[in-house]
């Protein structure tokens, strides 16, 4: 980790992989190899042993936290003498491009939905709240896509606050990684889930990170439990390049893909292109905006080579 170890020692309890795996207790494995195949991201090699060692203990921890919040809600209901609208428990997952946030989110969604106390678990990504492509071009932000200023933060905060207020139905824009843009006239509908997982680059950001809007609410103000998926930048860059090369022969080959022109690149040229994108966009965004929020997370999942978790840090 790039932050001094003494900071982590002060803020977190550290668990090596085997120590963390021992906290699973009797939580059953509810995913099959076929289930896991559907949840894996591009170029990720997550196995059932990874689910057993890392994600089952985490699902147990989250279940305990959700249960504690539900009990506090019952006590408040008794005190107030009425039952307020159902408010979901909100989990955020942050981290760099290519670190595997989406896979982590999907696995947790699948595992948490098997707990009888909270069977309805929804998942959204903040990608849908990126400004439309035309608006990014108008604002001169196309080369800063993924940076905080490229998101419609007002709409994102309004969405998450409506969820937290217990509104019956709330909609979120849907993003296409093929067209590199929002899908017009399509929405994801959230209808009072027990748990909402929100995954994105900047979901740990606070007013301290915004020199302009220091007083307005941020997504992090509405989150009950936050997770940061971490890895050394050299690994992140390698994973990004590997994923780019996979997309070149996969998603980029579609004529509808915004990046279709990349599908015609040879290996050497494609590698150089991906490396340049990392060095000019994703790397600086990580350094300036994403990594500085890491120590705000309740839990840090530290990855080593091959996307395998080797350490878990739990906030004291």
From Swiss-Prot:
A single Gene Ontology CC term: cytoplasm
Subcellular location: Cytoplasm
Keyword Nuclease: no
Pfam families per record: PRK
Catalyses which reaction(s): (R)-pantothenate + ATP = (R)-4'-phosphopantothenate + ADP + H(+)
Gene3D superfamilies, per the entry: P-loop containing nucleotide triphosphate hydrolases
Keywords (A to Z) from UniProt: ATP-binding, Coenzyme A biosynthesis, Cytoplasm, Kinase, Nucleotide-binding, Transferase
GO annotation, biological process: coenzyme A biosynthetic process
Location, primary (coarse class): cytoplasm
GO MF annotation, one: pantothenate kinase activity
Binding site for ATP: 95-102
UniProt pathway: Cofactor biosynthesis; coenzyme A biosynthesis; CoA from (R)-pantothenate: step 1/5
Signal peptide span: none
Similarity remark: Belongs to the prokaryotic pantothenate kinase family.
UniProt name for this protein: Pantothenate kinase
Organism encoding this protein: Shewanella halifaxensis (strain HAW-EB4)
